[in-house]
From Swiss-Prot:
Keywords: Cell membrane, Disulfide bond, G-protein coupled receptor, Glycoprotein, Membrane, Olfaction, Receptor, Sensory transduction, Transducer, Transmembrane, Transmembrane helix. It comes from Pan troglodytes. This is Olfactory receptor 3A3. The chain crosses the membrane at residues 29-52, 61-82, 104-123, 144-161, 200-222, 240-262, 276-295. GO terms for cellular component: plasma membrane. SUPFAM superfamilies: Family A G protein-coupled receptor-like (SSF81321). GO terms for biological process: signal transduction. The keyword Endoplasmic reticulum does not apply. It is found in: Cell membrane. It comes from the Eukaryota. Disulfide bonds join C100-C192. The gene is OR3A3. CDD domains: 7tmA_OR3A-like. Odorant receptor. InterPro entries: GPCR_Rhodpsn, GPCR_Rhodpsn_7TM, Olfact_rcpt.
């Protein structure tokens, strides 16, 4: 630990991440499982992205947002899993203070972007189903890019605010984090100075980035369901519900795990439940998303099959 200039307090130079398991035998199992999950997630999401790029039929607003979501999923798992794999290989559980802050920043940047992107996707479905005559006008390429740019700006501002606010806290020790990556609730527990401002910022962020988007998504889909029920064609209703069902499943999993993680700031210490939710947020969610969207979408399935045929013909 290093002494802070001008004070009698000490600053933690690095943290110790306890990880998912402590026994060496189980660490080998965890390494294999995480490596498998990482390869499946990156492969699945990049395949969907490639299919969207090469298939002209998928050059629509819905798939533009889905392609961006695939990039986010790859980024989300890359922020946490490779670093953990490195620690398991080297048998080192420490992470430097700066690396911890960097991980936290990028995690919240990508998670924040996820919030806004899922909201944009709900707005896209609302316009496509409830306002079909003006859809191409209200959701043109300029609007799509603007929505993504605004989402990145808001997510960046949120992540930077939390990271800067965290640098004002004093960490005097102990420096043991009962988790496998750096996040706000666990770091708040280690602070020897008041975290009241930080928790207030997190509360405001939750209102702006979770509650407001969730309300917007709920209202949008209430209108969508009402409009779909008025469709006379059974095939049309099935296709609309299939597309919307995939998105709602992803929204439910994402917000469900997020609420559990950040609405428990009053708890005294981290538990294995927090680690389980962390695995769901950073590993399971990104791995499931391609499966959810491709299983219920014949267009994506067709594009992926074409991609495989092209790949085989090239080899």
């Amino acid at each position: 630990m290093e002494s802070e200039a001008g004070t009698n307090r000490t600053a933690v130079a690095e943290f110790m991440l306890l990880g998912l398991v402590q026994t060496e035998e189980m660490q080998s199992v965890i390494f294999v499982l995480l490596l498998f999950a990482y390869l499946v997630t990156t492969g699945g999401n990049l395949s969907i992205l490639a299919a969207i790029l090469v298939e002209p039929k998928l050059h629509t607003p819905m798939y533009f947002f889905l392609g961006n979501l695939s990039v986010l999923d790859v980024g989300c798992i890359t922020v946490t899993v490779p670093a953990m794999l490195g620690r398991l290989l080297s048998h080192k559980s420490t992470i430097s203070y700066d690396a911890c802050l960097s991980q936290l920043f990028f995690f919240h940047l990508l998670a924040g972007m996820d919030c806004f992107l899922l909201t944009a996707m709900a707005y896209d479905r609302f316009l496509a189903i409830c306002r079909p005559l003006t859809y191409s006008t209200h959701m043109n390429q300029r609007v799509q890019r603007m929505l993504v740019a605004v989402s990145w700006t808001c997510a960046f501002t949120n992540a930077l605010t939390h990271t800067i606010a965290l640098t004002t806290l004093n960490f005097c020790g102990p420096s043991v984090i009962n988790h496998f990556y750096c996040d706000l609730p666990q770091l708040f527990q280690l602070s020897c100075s008041s975290t009241q401002l930080n928790e207030l910022l997190l509360f405001v962020a939750a209102a702006v980035m979770a509650v407001a988007p969730l309300v917007f998504i709920s209202v949008s889909y209430a209108h969508v369901v009402a409009a779909v029920l008025q469709i006379h064609s059974a095939e049309g209703r099935k296709k609309a519900f299939s597309t919307c069902g995939s998105h709602l499943t992803v929204v439910g999993i994402f917000y469900g795990t997020g609420v559990f993680s950040y609405m428990r700031l009053g708890s005294v210490e981290s538990s294995d439940k927090d680690k389980g939710v962390g695995v769901f947020m950073t590993v399971i969610n990104p791995m499931l998303n391609p499966l959810i969207y491709s299983l219920r979408n014949t267009d994506v399935q067709g594009a992926l099959c074409q991609l495989l045929v092209v790949k085989r013909s090239l080899t």
